[in-house]
Amino acid sequence: MKYNTHTLDNGLRIIHLPSDSKVVYCGYQINAGTRNEEPGEEGLAHFCEHVTFKGTERRKAWHILNCLESVGGDLNAYTNKEGTVYYSAILKEHIARAVDLLSDIVFHSVYPQAEIDKEVEVICDEIESYNDSPAELIYDEFENILFKGSSLGHNILGTAEQVRSFTTEDALRFTRKLYRPDNAIFFAYGDIDFKKLVKLVGRALADDDSGKLAEEDCHADFSGGTGFAGDENSITTEKSVSSVKSVGPKNYPSVGEEIAGQTIVMQKNTHQAHVMIGTRAYDVNDDRRMPLYLLNNILGGPGMNAKLNLALREHNGLVYTVESTMVAYGDTGTWSIYFGCDEHDIKRCLRLVRKELDRMMEKPLSASQLKAAKKQIKGQIGVACDNRENFALDFGKSFLHYGWEKNVDCLYEQVEAITSQQIQDVARELFDKDRLITLIFK
């Protein structure tokens, strides 16, 4: 894959992957997530994402909403623990419009208090909707247990009380500190001329470096080792660059002896019990991450033939949903299993889960099992990469935080290099019953 890259004088990195599509996916990935919030600011990163659409020095809220919609485009944003993303999907003939709008809202929003007062209620409704979904809420509560006392521990949305306290001044303080060109990247995936793109972005940011694009900047063929950033569906090539910013302080605590191996029950008065089992795992740079990637897919990946799905759903009819998940942050990670079941089936489900974990710890995969697992995950990767929007968002995220660019062929090579012994070693380390924490909502 041939990526085009260029860095403006103001520090903004631009990355572009050509495609034959008439649709361009582009936007800003900013190193400003919930990990960057100070105590008392919980929910501020997500709040800023919402109110960034509410007016700039040049545009009112209505003009922002209508700018791309009027030509059939899409404007969207999201916040996670390590970043905030503003992006668009637009026909390539409207790329100048998208670049100008995105640059305007990211770097020139004024956050009018009158608009904030309205949007706060929208955010609070989002919080209430989330609180009504225990299958989602349990993931945040689980991370709060794993990373209690750190910025990774609190959820992205914050509380309604906290959100209602935020003002224009709070949004300006947070974004002026973090929404900077040298703390962001602009990504684009589509059939557009890269030199033109650099000039458009430079002009939108009034950067006089935009006309100094050298020919050698236009053709960077990155083909290093492979990996994935963030979660098990993110795919990238590992190639470090010196300008990569830290994703956050290493302020997470170790899982304490008081909770390691323990079961924590929370009364939520739900119709169904919700259960998570897991532990802290590997960061995005850890060599054990790829064996865990494959192991996780074997156990609880999206395939109906995943071991946990067969054990709990297909063979015993105990659950509708069971899945395992891994998340790799810049300096730590998580691995967990989730399932929902009737309350009286909790113990039986836990025994079946433990049985599958013990099997992975005690017996290495046979050569045929390993070959089948690799074939399956490579197929899933190929299908996932066909989603152009997700592909664009992922390579932008990877380049911002880790200096890696997607290279699916290299990822396939690294999948092929995984051994049964590596998988068993990871299973023995992570699946130790004295290490795992169990959280139950009922």
Ranges and model annotations:
Residues 46, 50, 274, 315:
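Histidine-centered active-site/metal-ligand motif
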Residues 13-15, 414:
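Residues located in well-ordered beta-strands
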Residues 7, 64-219, 225, 231, ...:
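Charge-rich, well-structured scaffold segments of protease-associated domains
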